[in-house]
């Protein structure tokens, strides 16, 4: 399975949540809301989940084997690190109105 796109929305704040990611496979299937979390031993990836009526969390989508999990984690962590190392330039839309 080939990863064809990874998008990350960086989140600034006091919580351990550092960002939210979407990953696309072979331009045909996307998994949204993958959380990027700062843990005690560094960044880790949490697959999208929902809270059950019993208060437990259950993954909505997740990899079946360790190779696929590693592929997803590596792609997201690499893209996240690239975002930290090369933040997007903010465009200045203000107009200088000197007459």
Swiss-Prot record:
Keywords recorded for this protein, A-Z: Cell cycle, Cell division, Septation
InterPro entries: SpoVG, SpoVG_sf
Taxonomic superkingdom: Bacteria
Keyword hit for S-adenosyl-L-methionine: no
Pfam families found in the cross-reference section: SpoVG
Biological process per Gene Ontology, one example term: sporulation resulting in formation of a cellular spore
Family: Belongs to the SpoVG family.
Alphabetical list of HAMAP family matching this protein: SpoVG
Entries under NCBIfam families matching the protein: PRK13259.1 (NF009749)
Primary role: Could be involved in septation.
UniProt name for this protein: Putative septation protein SpoVG
Record organism: Onion yellows phytoplasma (strain OY-M)
């Amino acid at each position: 399975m080939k990863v064809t796109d990874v998008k990350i929305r960086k989140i600034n704040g006091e919580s351990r949540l550092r960002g939210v990611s979407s990953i696309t496979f072979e331009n045909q299937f996307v998994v949204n809301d993958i959380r990027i979390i700062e843990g005690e031993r560094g960044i880790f990836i949490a697959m999208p989940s929902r809270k059950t009526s019993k208060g437990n969390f259950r993954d909505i989508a997740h990899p079946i084997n360790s190779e696929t999990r590693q592929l997803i984690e590596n792609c997201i962590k690499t893209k996240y690190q690239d975002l930290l190392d090369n933040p997007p330039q903010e465009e200045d839309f203000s107009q200088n109105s000197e007459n």
